Amino acid sequence: MTGSSKIKVALIVLNDLGSGGAYNYESGVIKDLVLAEKSPFEFLIFAPHKLVGATKQRFPDLVVRPYRSGLITMFFLSLRSSLQGYKLLKTIGLRYGRLERSLVRENVSLAYFLAPNALVLDLVDTPTINTVWDLGHRDIPEFVEITGDRHFEERELFYRHALPKSFRVVVD
């Protein structure tokens, strides 16, 4: 295949070096995908704005683009998550959030979220692959670390909305 006929896949990272296993997992998946011979895919990385420099150093042969996930992004994500909010945003020309606008600009066909990431909920048209590391919160809901500060509900809500819409789900 020529470079122009390859399917563009965005690898969406979330974690920095201080995240330990999460960072190592994301880096390992990227290395495995990039090293695959005769791949029909062209990969580019989307990293949180503050991690772009370190990500470029780690993967100098890949295009790295920034994304933001601050308060304004999360506000629009919550609006876009409801049908009424989506209709309102679509009416005023904000059908897509920042990340999806970047994906469209780059002609990305598939977004692979290498870690659980709330921004997947902001995508309207881009197909996704999502990663689930564990569902342990269901096994031990009696611990305040799991149920305190609405962590249990947060995880359940995320999985309930993100996974059914996913093209594929990777469980590790």
Which sequence ranges carry the predicted segments?
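Carbohydrate transferase catalytic cores enriched for Leloir-type hexosyltransferases
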Residues: M1-D172
